UniProtKB/Swiss-Prot annotation:
Function in brief: Involved in the catabolism of L-rhamnose (6-deoxy-L-mannose). Catalyzes the transfer of the gamma-phosphate group from ATP to the 1-hydroxyl group of L-rhamnulose to yield L-rhamnulose 1-phosphate.
CDD domains per record: ASKHA_NBD_FGGY_RhaB-like (cd07771)
PANTHER family, per the entry: L-RHAMNULOKINASE, SUGAR KINASE
Taxon lineage: Bacteria, Pseudomonadati, Pseudomonadota, Gammaproteobacteria, Enterobacterales
Gene: rhaB
Gene Ontology cellular component list: cytosol
The protein's name: Rhamnulokinase
Amino acid sequence: MTFRHCVAVDLGASSGRVMLARYDSKHRTLTLREIHRFVNCLQKTDGFDTWDIDSLEKDIRLGLKKVCNEGILIDSIGIDTWGVDYVLLDKQGQRVGLPVSYRDNRTTGIMPQALVQIGKSEIYRRSGIQFLPFNTIYQLRALTKQQPELTAQVAHALLMPDYFSYRLTGEMNWEYTNATTTQLVNINTDDWDDTLLAWTGAKKSWFGRPSHPGNVIGDWICPQGNRIPVVAVASHDTASAVIASPLANKHSAYLSSGTWSLMGFESKMPYTTDEALAANITNEGGAEGRYRVLKNIMGLWLLQRVLKERRITDLPALIAQTEALPACRFLINPNDDRFINPDDMRAEIQAACRETDQPVPVSDAELARCIFDSLALLYADILHEQANLRGEKFTQLHIVGGGCQNSLLNQLCADACGIRVMAGPVEASTLGNIGIQLMTLDELNNVDDFRQVVSANYDLTTYIPNPDSEIARHVAQFQPKRQTKELCA
């Protein structure tokens, strides 16, 4: 067959998309077309920050039906989402309550309990995953301790992409790359860790053994009656984004830039040394047995909140105003846990600057400048940290995802990190999702083969570092700003 049509459902924490890919196996051309885009946002339910799971499912089905109504024969479907959040089901397979967001404050104070009762080094030895207060391990502990009546109804727990695949196929699956984000998968066995799971109070019977990307979960029957296979792709959106990152060699790092920024490198072995633990490095699962050695950074969430609060709709105009301002007048630590979900992001940023005896950003452009400069400096700090961890410097950084469209931030990143930055592709998560589908359909050999297809079909923008820039001169001075209470504290 010359042409393949694959559908990627790509859900982020702020929006979702149904995308159609067309692959010409003869000429190895790959094109994407957006079929349906929709909003994803938090809602308050009984005092919890929850996801409107029914609305998301409705939009997914609407997007799939739009493709089918065009008369296109779909070869496969894949779903990727953000990590750590889950949906509870009863023994009839019906949903129990609404899924609570990782940004909800129910996990406050839970992680310190685990550090005392199990031990930080023991948790890290077992999971190899970074300590974030909203990891699934702490969410489940909060659930079982705070809502025992709800817990009693539960027979299964599915992570977000697995839930939507279940709703399409009727078959349950626990995909490996996303499962590793829970901090509950044993890094040596790739199965759920009995000790960590027992501590949460959740039953092991809620979960099936994690499966690696590439298996067919089941079929979705389209309105025309065709059975379309639903593939378990690398269902954590960052895992998919990394698959589509055209990494040149082992000296290339990646930065998946969106609501979250995830910065790291690929490795055939995990890094679980005391040094890695001290740096709060995570070893999330990737495709083909590779590890995504990385660190979570709060990312463009700060900007997204400011845009929403200030009702700013013209982002290019704001960036142009921001670029005209002097660099590094206002600096914060974007990974300070005060920025996870404040009532007022603008006020929180201003308070952080005030508390560190800095000028206080007032205008929208000043707030954006503060965010961009601070992110670029944090990227540089973490890249240096990771280079020391592996004992080799990086020579190139690939920025993928929606954030790679921000040319100002890309240049600031190149200047601060002191290495060449390659920006693109924008739709990295969607492309990585499609890549696993094409491998499952035997159209591509492996991830490296797929990256060659990406490189041939998608243009990248190069940013050369300027060592004389203002931000480059501030790199060494930024470290004290990170001595605030970070996400892992």
